């Protein structure tokens, strides 16, 4: 019999409290899902609430399914205890139609049930993401062609401003970027118009630029630099004052300090600060004769650094007075209004085309639902009031990842005091999906704890006990984040109130469970022979060319060394039978492969390298990175065949098919065919060559052409998916690829192609020609499709995955690898920056004068977005460290020069501050800063190892040489695991033709 759960006092509050809006701040591993399920059960059992009177909104479909299963299991348990309770039995039936779903599913339900309230067909369908992207490109082409033909003057000016007539792609990308961004706002067109109107100043009425939100941010930035400079100079001035021989140097440096203090005192007003900075003259430091130089030389170094930092910041900000700043912004108003018009034109045509195809995307569904639930004045409609009556409570899981549209929708159907929100703002890591952690934070600051709550207050509950991890994991995580996460950088003060507190009951396994940090130092000097370089991966939320933020090109050679080290670390854990605690068996056991995860910030570049090195040691591993599905051999082979079935005159696909396993022609045979007629199309040559080639080749050609002709006839009456599956059977190609290396994966990829074809038959890409065109457009849009996944969660393999994909998971041993990878801040250099409050940041562009530079509004937004991006990176690091149950291992590459520079910076400051933290370029930088400032505490919680790249290479070279059987062993292990699992993903009945 299972033990009864012992809920903490805080968990009990989250389960039983009611009659107000409730925000549950649930730290990592605090059992929030279990609490939410128990709250639902309590509503059903004790409060006699039927399950269909609850709306439970989850972040993913998988989470919704898990929630349903847990609730059903709990209901059955209660039925076992009370078999005569008919009401409980009825809940099982009601659960089938209960609203436990994602926000997308709920909105879809609202729209389908109320389609008559808006201008939409009852039979609309949800479009495939790729289909939407292709349609967007088609609409842009149509729109631009129309504008070119009509010689639209506004359009011509936009082309001049953003493309210079060389290529209109940048303008198209700009339109799509802004269009997609504004869809996360409840009223997209209104938001865009309001933010553009922020540029519509009356110059005569303008106040000091410091009165704008942009000016406040920029002056705050300068103040931080000036404050920091004063902190650094004061000790140097004091040292010089104590040395009689350095009187002249003292007076000179004192004068510099006075100027900084004067600027500091006037940073509340833009024009004062601008005027003072413009007249500042720090002079040239002359040498004192016959004096000791140590104090002066050090003071000179500090001064140069301070003035250099001030110059690099102020020269980008205090470059114009208020009038000039406003004038720059006003000058961009006209072009932005023209851009707005083009975006609205695109939006209207795009909406029209979707309507013609009777399709919508999920963004449409949300906005349709909003239109149904809120009237023009933002008040709940009669339909919304019906939903208010329908639901006794609205529970929102992962609330930190909500956006503003979802907030409006769920608030509109609430009674005003019946929303239960659970989440952890420290795990808000979906900024690129327009998640708004500020929604959580605003409630976190205003809702009251129970002891402080009055009748009209909303309630805040904190779940701070962690039931996932050992004390060693929690203590290390708490140390790191208590030193780096603040409201200024991190958007939350990580005080003791936020600490992860031990809740798990682990037994001693006799292992050293201190966090292990392994830094691999790499030489700064370039090798005589240039190593192979890898382009830096650009995620959808990344972009920067500014020297201050430039991401270094990652070198494949260096990543390989770190991957070697990680592979050996995993082998040591397995070979040494590292002990982990089995909570179910309540005893320790040997570690398994599946107990280990390698987490990477991004997987596209690094994951294949780590996978390769781990496989070399005979370790079964599964990498969850996106591979190039459309470039895989099996997909290219079938796509080439489909192309010639559609049109055999296409030479490249024809020759490729003939050379493939399906065609079976040798290179010599193809040359023989070509030589029979060098000038005609290859297909025509093939038809004519039958009389000019050997009998054996003639028979081969006849058989090939007959097969192609048969498929061409069959395509006229078979559906596309039926044709593809028939090709698999006719050629035996499906079975053939199953015998190749990674055969199960290749077969699963072919099944995915079949499924994709089946989907296209039901949408606007029906038929062979349209399907080929659909796939080609995916390629030209630089998109791809993920390869099939055929490894289950219980398979005994080491996993490599991104930190984002690990969210919600847990592993006994977490290896956070590539922690020295620099943050990608490239979005900060886009031509236009978009911010929910600060609006639009643009470059000042004068096409006629060939002048372009960032407006101050853009600089302010860039500054704000950098802080927000670093804050999100901090939260991503929090997610990574809190996946570990028993041990954390952190590895990363670092240049020795950079480590020395960090040590120099640390010596300048008495404590770790935001200036140092905001200059960090990687997770390893933050961890290193904590180590340097809190070395004694860190040493009690972590082992700090500095390794040389060359030593690791030697270590790996002196171990047992790589053997082919090691590779084969890893592959064999994977094949055994994968056996028959492709069929688990796809129902075989689907493929019966």
Label the model's feature ranges.
Residues 118, 820-830:
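Cytochrome P450 core scaffold surrounding the K-helix E-X-X-R motif
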């Amino acid at each position: 019999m299972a033990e009864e759960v012992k809920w903490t006092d805080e968990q009990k509050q989250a389960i039983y409290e009611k009659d107000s809006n409730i925000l549950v701040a649930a730290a990592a591993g605090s059992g929030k899902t279990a609490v939410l399920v128990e709250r639902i059960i309590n509503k059903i059992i004790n409060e006699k609430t039927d399950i269909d009177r609850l709306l439970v909104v989850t972040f993913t479909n998988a989470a919704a399914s898990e929630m349903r299963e847990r609730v059903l299991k709990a209901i059955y348990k209660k039925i076992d205890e009370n078999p005569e309770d008919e009401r409980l039995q009825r809940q099982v039936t009601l659960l089938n139609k209960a609203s436990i779903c994602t926000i997308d599913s709920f909105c879809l339900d609202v729209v389908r049930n109320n389609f008559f309230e808006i201008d939409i067909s009852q039979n609309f369908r949800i479009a495939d993401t790729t289909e939407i992207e292709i349609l967007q490109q088609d609409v842009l082409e149509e729109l631009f062609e129309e504008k070119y033909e009509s010689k639209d003057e506004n359009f011509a000016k936009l082309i001049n401003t953003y493309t210079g007539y060389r290529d209109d792609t940048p303008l198209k990308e700009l339109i799509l970027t802004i269009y997609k961004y504004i869809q996360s706002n409840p009223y997209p067109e209104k938001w865009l118009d309001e933010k553009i109107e922020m540029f519509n100043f009356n110059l005569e009425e303008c106040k000091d630029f410091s009165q704008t939100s942009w000016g406040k941010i920029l002056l705050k930035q300068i103040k931080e630099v000036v404050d920091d400079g004063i902190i650094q100079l004061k000790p140097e001035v004091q040292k010089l004052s104590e040395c009689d021989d350095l009187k002249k140097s003292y007076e000179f440096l004192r004068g510099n300090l006075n100027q900084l203090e004067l600027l500091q005192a006037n940073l509340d007003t833009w024009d004062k600060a601008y005027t003072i900075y413009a007249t500042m003259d720090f002079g040239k430091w002359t040498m004192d004769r016959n004096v000791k130089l140590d104090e002066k030389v050090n003071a000179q170094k500090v001064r140069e650094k301070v003035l250099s930092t001030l110059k690099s910041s102020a020269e980008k900000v205090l470059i114009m007075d208020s009038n000039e700043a406003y004038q720059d912004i006003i000058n961009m108003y006209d072009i932005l209004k023209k851009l707005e018009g083009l975006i609205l034109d695109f939006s209207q045509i795009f909406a029209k085309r979707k309507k013609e195809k009777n399709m919508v995307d999920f963004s449409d569904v949300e906005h349709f639902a909003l239109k149904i639930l809120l009237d023009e004045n933002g008040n709940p409609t009669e339909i919304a009031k019906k939903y208010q009556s329908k639901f006794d409570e609205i529970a929102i899981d992962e609330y930190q990842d909500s956006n503003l549209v979802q907030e409006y929708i769920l608030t509109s159907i609430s009674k005003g005091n019946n929303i239960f929100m659970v989440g952890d703002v420290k795990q808000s890591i979906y900024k690129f999906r327009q998640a708004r952690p500020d929604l959580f934070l605003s409630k976190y600051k205003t809702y009251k704890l129970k002891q402080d709550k009055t009748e009209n207050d909303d309630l805040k509950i904190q779940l701070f006990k962690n039931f996932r991890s050992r004390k060693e994991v929690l203590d290390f995580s708490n140390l790191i984040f208590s030193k780096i996460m603040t409201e200024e950088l991190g958007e939350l003060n990580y005080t003791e109130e936020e600490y992860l507190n031990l809740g798990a009951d682990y037994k001693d396994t006799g292992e050293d469970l201190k966090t292990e940090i392994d830094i691999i130092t790499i030489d700064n000097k370039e090798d005589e022979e240039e190593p192979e370089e890898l382009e830096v991966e650009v995620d959808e939320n990344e972009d920067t060319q500014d020297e201050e933020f430039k991401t270094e090109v990652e070198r494949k050679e260096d990543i390989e060394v770190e991957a070697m080290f990680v592979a050996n670390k995993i082998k040591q854990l397995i070979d040494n039978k590292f002990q982990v605690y089995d909570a179910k068996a309540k005893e320790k056991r040997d570690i398994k492969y599946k107990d280990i995860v390698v987490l990477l910030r991004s997987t596209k570049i690094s994951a294949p390298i780590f996978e390769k090195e781990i496989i070399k040691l005979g370790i079964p591993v599964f990498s969850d990175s996106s591979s190039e599905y459309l470039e895989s051999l099996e997909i290219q082979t079938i796509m080439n065949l489909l192309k010639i079935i559609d049109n055999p005159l296409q030479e490249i696909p024809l020759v490729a098919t003939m050379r493939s396993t399906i065609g079976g022609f040798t290179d010599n045979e193809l040359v023989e065919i070509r030589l029979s007629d060098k000038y005609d199309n290859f297909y025509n040559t093939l038809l004519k060559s039958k009389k000019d080639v050997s009998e054996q080749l003639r028979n081969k050609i006849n058989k090939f052409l007959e097969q192609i002709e048969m498929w061409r006839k069959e395509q006229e009456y078979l559906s596309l998916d039926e044709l593809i599956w028939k090709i698999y059977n006719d050629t035996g190609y499906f079975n053939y690829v199953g015998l190749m290396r990674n055969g199960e994966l290749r077969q699963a990829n072919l099944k995915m192609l079949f499924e994709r074809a089946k989907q296209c038959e039901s949408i606007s890409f029906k038929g062979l020609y349209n399907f080929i065109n659909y796939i080609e457009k995916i390629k030209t849009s630089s998109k791809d499709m993920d390869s099939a996944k055929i490894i289950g969660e219980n398979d005994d393999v080491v996993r490599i995955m991104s930190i984002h994909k690990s969210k919600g998971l847990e592993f006994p041993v977490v290896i956070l690898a590539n922690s020295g990878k620099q943050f990608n801040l490239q979005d900060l250099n886009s031509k236009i920056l978009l911010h929910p409050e600060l609006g639009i940041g643009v470059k000042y562009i004068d096409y006629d004068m060939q002048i372009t530079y960032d407006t101050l509004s853009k600089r302010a937004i860039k500054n704000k977005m950098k802080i927000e991006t670093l804050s999100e990176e901090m939260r991503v690091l929090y997610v990574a460290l809190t996946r570990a149950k028993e041990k954390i291992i952190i590895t990363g590459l670092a240049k020795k020069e950079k480590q020395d520079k960090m040590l120099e910076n640390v010596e300048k400051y008495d404590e770790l501050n935001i200036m140092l933290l905001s200059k960090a370029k990687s997770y390893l930088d933050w961890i290193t800063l904590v180590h340097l400032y809190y070395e004694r505490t860190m040493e009690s919680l972590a082992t700090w190892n500095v390794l040389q790249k060359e030593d690791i290479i030697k270590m790996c070279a002196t171990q047992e040489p790589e053997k082919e059987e090691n590779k084969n062993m890893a592959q064999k292990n994977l094949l055994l695991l994968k056996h028959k699992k492709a069929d688990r993903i796809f129902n075989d009945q689907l493929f019966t033709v």
